[in-house]
Amino acid sequence: MRTLNTSAMDGTGLVVERDFSVRILTACFLSLLILSTLLGNTLVCAAVIRFRHLRSKVTNFFVISLAVSDLLVAVLVMPWKAVAEIAGFWPFGSFCNIWVAFDIMCSTASILNLCVISVDRYWAISSPFRYERKMTPKAAFILISVAWTLSVLISFIPVQLSWHKAKPTSPSDGNATSLAETIDNCDSSLSRTYAISSSVISFYIPVAIMIVTYTRIYRIAQKQIRRIAALERAAVHAKNCQTTTGNGKPVECSQPESSFKMSFKRETKVLKTLSVIMGVFVCCWLPFFILNCILPFCGSGETQPFCIDSNTFDVFVWFGWANSSLNPIIYAFNADFRKAFSTLLGCYRLCPATNNAIETVSINNNGAAMFSSHHEPRGSISKECNLVYLIPHAVGSSEDLKKEEAAGIARPLEKLSPALSVILDYDTDVSLEKIQPITQNGQHPT
């Protein structure tokens, strides 16, 4: 008997020690995730507040709205759930309903802002002239207001009126569920109607829009890259054919194969960039929303494949929230924001003063292309920088390209209809960072 009791005590102690180790690891991981989310999104907000040229770009309004929604996820949602995960129960009592409303509101706002950014990028690329006229600060604020209003309506009203909860099968079950939610946990089961409707509005419609817009963006970029490559080959071909030997006879000229390889690398780079944007978003949120629609149809004793326990479901909840820590890296790490971050953190003092060689290709409606190159020191921020990026930003202004064209070399080429300006660095790392409307006279609009 004594041996059995000792073994039982040792087994219990081992379980307790293992449980304590798991809690410590969980606390470290969740703390790191929360801190990274806070740091990344705070840097985005601080950069826009600190640097005026970032505030002057309409497209950055959407990035700021996204950063605010992700920052609210890190402040109003993640810490409370992290404490509950570590403690093993919900210690905040009746705050549960308010927390659930914040969770739905902030997560929905983050996803809808991602959707708005994709639509904004598509408009800027497909109709640059119309975009420049109609995408005013007022229009941007209207789009942002719609996203946030929809997020509030889908969260606070149903939660405060208890429309989101599944109806209990009996009065005793209802009392037990209510007591459990307010004391021990905050994992209220959603009703089937609310789970499906909220998932459709918060995720499935936005992800469908994002897939369509980014697919069309890739097709437009692919078409323009191939068009530019064809014009480059024609220019090189014409130049080579003009070369003559000592006898005055032209040298046989051939099509350069390097242009085909460079075009393929550019297309691959664009595809990788868009794949990262969509892949990260889908991998983070899709598992949660699939389970969110399936679990309301599972009974209390179901053992079906997708009827998982609450602990496994919580893992996918954290996967979705982790998207808020990745958004600043994906959507705010263009050249302007990187320079702003370096200045805010003082990193440019520690980094070597390397120059980034950039080639700008501007093509107007009459088919005239202007090629120019300049070197931009890393860590420097221009006082008046009005560039707006395609991924995740698009349309640029006239002042920067006018300066570039003043030092550039003009090369007349064949006919080309849409105006396009693409930034290509010398190692074929394509970011497609500018699309600049050009008038028929070859001048940028003022």
From Swiss-Prot:
GO molecular function, one term: G protein-coupled receptor activity
Gene Ontology cellular-component annotations: ciliary membrane; cilium; dendritic spine; endoplasmic reticulum membrane; G protein-coupled receptor complex; GABA-ergic synapse; glutamatergic synapse; non-motile cilium
Membrane topology: Multi-pass membrane protein
Chief localisation class: membrane
CDD domains: 7tmA_D1A_dopamine_R
Pfam annotation, one family: 7tm_1
Extracellular side stretches: 1-23, 88-96, 164-192, 300-312
Lipidation (S-palmitoyl cysteine): 347, 351
Localization (cell): Cell membrane; Endoplasmic reticulum membrane; Cell projection, Cilium membrane; Cell projection, Dendrite
Transmembrane segments: 24-49, 61-87, 97-119, 139-163, 193-218, 273-299, 313-337
Entry's Gene Ontology BP terms: adenylate cyclase-activating adrenergic receptor signaling pathway; adenylate cyclase-activating dopamine receptor signaling pathway; adenylate cyclase-activating G protein-coupled receptor signaling pathway; adult walking behavior; astrocyte development; behavioral fear response; behavioral response to cocaine; cellular response to catecholamine stimulus
Coiled-coil residue spans: none
Disulfide bonding pattern of the chain: 96-186
UniProt tissue specificity: Detected in caudate, nucleus accumbens and in the olfactory tubercle.
Side of membrane Cytoplasmic, spans: 50-60, 120-138, 219-272, 338-446
Recorded superkingdom: Eukaryota
SMART domains referenced in this protein's UniProt entry, alphabetically: 7TM_GPCR_Srsx
Family, as annotated: Belongs to the G-protein coupled receptor 1 family.
Subunit structure: Interacts with DNAJC14 via its C-terminus. Interacts with DRD2. Interacts with DORIP1.
Function description: Dopamine receptor whose activity is mediated by G proteins which activate adenylyl cyclase.
UniProt-recorded name of the protein: D(1A) dopamine receptor
Organism: Homo sapiens (Human)
